[in-house]
Amino acid sequence: VGALPAISYDTDLGLGFGLIASVARFAPKFVPYRWRLELLLSANAKRAPGRGIEVPFHDDYLNMDFPGLAGDRLRITARVGFRKFANTGYYGFGNGSIAEEPWVGIDPETDLAAYQAARRYHRYDRIFPLLQFSARIRLWDRSTAEQRKRVEAFVGLHGDYNIIRPYPGSLLEQDIAAAKADTPEGETLADLLQGTDPHARLTVNGGAVFDTRDHEYTPTRGNFTELSVRAAPGVQLGLRYVGVTLSSAWYKALVGDWLSIAFRGVADVIAGDAPFYELARFGALTPRDGPGGGWSLRGVPRQRYAGKIKLIQNLELRSLFWRFSIGKSRFAVGAVAFLDAARIWADWRRTELGGVGIDGGSFKVGTGGGLRVRWGETFLVRFDAAYSPTERTSGFYVDVGHVF
């Protein structure tokens, strides 16, 4: 049993505050636990453009994890949640999309309203309650007490209801209007800019997982590979699409827990009429924002890049160098150095807007380092500072769990 203030920080979201609590029951022959519940009630506060404080992100959820069902062959996870993301990023599509700065030259002291509107040029408000369910079935298992060696299949459902609210004068508002024009540029935008009206969405997920990690939360040896498919039948607005993800993470101990190396490669592709916000996300088993943000390309703004084809790589050098106890609680402190890279394509064909290709440029890069604090066996907090030499932007992140 554990409960902590949910204190987090993200350059894009600001300071997070709230409560995170977890309850886990341990039992012999069940790794990592018999069951676990996690509750998060949180919001983020950030300095508003010009002056004042805004609350850009609100996140509540209850996670349920039952790994020991059907003779320890079935694992069921579920999440019920609600999110309000008032500064969701929208920069257009493709690897060559431009992050404009229309607020340059506007004095917030003399024209605060214009300055705040300009700072929201690449932002919109998204509100979505959600429900997730996933069942993982163990197909093959040769695990030992020291290390897993198993293959699992998973199936799941994800449902949400989305309300999209563009800010006046924002790029999203402009592109929604441009997508209605009977021009080549309008047709291109209309193909990519789907799902801007309120809508319900249902996706069916399925895939397989190969897991040889020595620890679920702080692995130093082994591999975790996901091959997954997510498909939406088009409940509303004709949002019918299929997404495929291949993600493989590798861990190698160099000097036990003292020094290890970790690498993840992700390829994510989408075909069909996906909602535009899905083009800035990847994965089915654990969906994440990216490329961009603290879970994919650190140092680059969240939702910075959007497209139907994504490649993401993460390399980390990890160390757990200090272990201690406070009462009956066990802690470990470590450090990480990392390098992230990503490349994206807007669509399967060459895509142009205004006669110019939007997929130019090379890989986007973020690099940095941070600290890790582990409490017990299932709770880890990370502190990461990052800089992107390709974007010339920086980020700082405090969150729960390794990036991969």
Stretches with model-predicted labels:
Residues 13-17, 21, 33, 54-60, ...:
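Residues that define the transmembrane beta-barrel architecture of outer-membrane proteins
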Residues 47-49, 61, 180-197, 201-338, ...:
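C-terminal outer-membrane beta-barrel translocator/porin domains of Gram-negative envelope proteins
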Residues 7-9, 19, 35-45, 76-84, ...:
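Transmembrane beta-barrel strands of outer-membrane/channel proteins
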Residues 371-373, 392-404:
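Outer-membrane beta-barrel "beta-signal"
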Residues 19, 50-52, 88-96, 165-174, ...:
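Outer-membrane beta-barrel translocator domains and adjoining extracellular loop/strand segments
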